[in-house]
Amino acid sequence: MEVNPPKQEHLLALKVMRLTKPTLFTNIPVTCEERDLPGDLFNQLMRDDPSTVNGAEVLMLGEMLTLPQNFGNIFLGETFSSYISVHNDSNQVVKDILVKADLQTSSQRLNLSASNAAVAELKPDCCIDDVIHHEVKEIGTHILVCAVSYTTQAGEKMYFRKFFKFQVLKPLDVKTKFYNAESDLSSVTDEVFLEAQIQNMTTSPMFMEKVSLEPSIMYNVTELNSVSQAGESVSTFGSRAYLQPMDTRQYLYCLKPKKEFAEKAGIIKGVTVIGKLDIVWKTNLGERGRLQTSQLQRMAPGYGDVRLSLEAIPDTVNLEEPFHITCKITNCSERTMDLVLEMCNTNSIHWCGISGRQLGKLHPSSSLCLALTLLSSVQGLQSISGLRLTDTFLKRTYEYDDIAQVCVISSAIKVES
């Protein structure tokens, strides 16, 4: 009795090859001076080499292309393409051939086959070809499972499969930082600055085609990665946005809440979704990759029960001449407040108007705009301070100092509007 029967050979052969872009052929030039012993021998060999560029033989980069010599690296965001070929190596006609390609990741199994229909028959020395594509969205171990089933002339059903394991690497390291904008000194606004640090983790340069921020429905975004020169927008990274291996680049964005959300004080509190980064790059011979981050979140700053912000203020004012500012008071609490406004003078800033006036009831998440008048008795950069809001129900006073700064100049100097 035979314990281990011989392994049956299949009539069909399966070949799987990864499809990638070719690379430019490179050679190492070897030269010498004419008075050296080899004379012009090395230079003549380079001129006769068909892979060199005429007139620039010492240039390492040639005019020819090199086909991929190995499987290579696969990075997150790239498109994995593979050529699958099933060839009939026998002298028999094989029937009901079904080729199935699945990609097994750490979290799911995907069917990549273009068609799940079986081929009626396959004659000797004929083949079935298929090309599969898949945008890689996970890092880690991936297994390409290729299964082939067919029926022989004798009616015997045959089946075999092959496994191809490969690793998906991370092409970019993305780090984000949030900065809450400050209006002058201490009056915190709703504007948020996002700094995105992107590092090239591959071994080849990248052309950064697009790095954009897709904001959430609560925010509008402004990109701060360009400057205006002669009426044209010029990128701060130059005309050639290449990112060399292990290099890092910083992108900056400003987000501001939409008007319908900014007017509702309670919505911007706590953890809010900012948006997500969309990064598109190109590598060897234009091979494209794309990466989208998950939704970015940040902790919104706390304003307390009452928030005071500035809507309008002049940059420069004249000495001992009244000027006007517009303040916005927002009730950030969940109860109705009855507020009283008090204005306290400082050594340089003097408020004009009645202190201790009633502002009336302010409902939750509602706002009130106030036009205030003041003057400065000291030249220079002066800080506006001395506003007090008192909640008559809780007898609680909210103090607002260093609200903003103005430049005070002599009245003999004309203030440019």
UniProtKB/Swiss-Prot annotation:
Superkingdom of the source species: Eukaryota
InterPro entries: TRAPPC13, TRAPPC13_C, TRAPPC13_M, TRAPPC13_N
Coiled-coil zones: none
Protein name: Trafficking protein particle complex subunit 13
Family the UniProt entry places it in: Belongs to the TRAPPC13 family.
Subunit description: Part of the multisubunit TRAPP (transport protein particle) complex.
PANTHER family tied to this protein: TRAFFICKING PROTEIN PARTICLE COMPLEX SUBUNIT 13 (PTHR13134:SF3)
GO cellular component terms, semicolon-separated: TRAPPIII protein complex
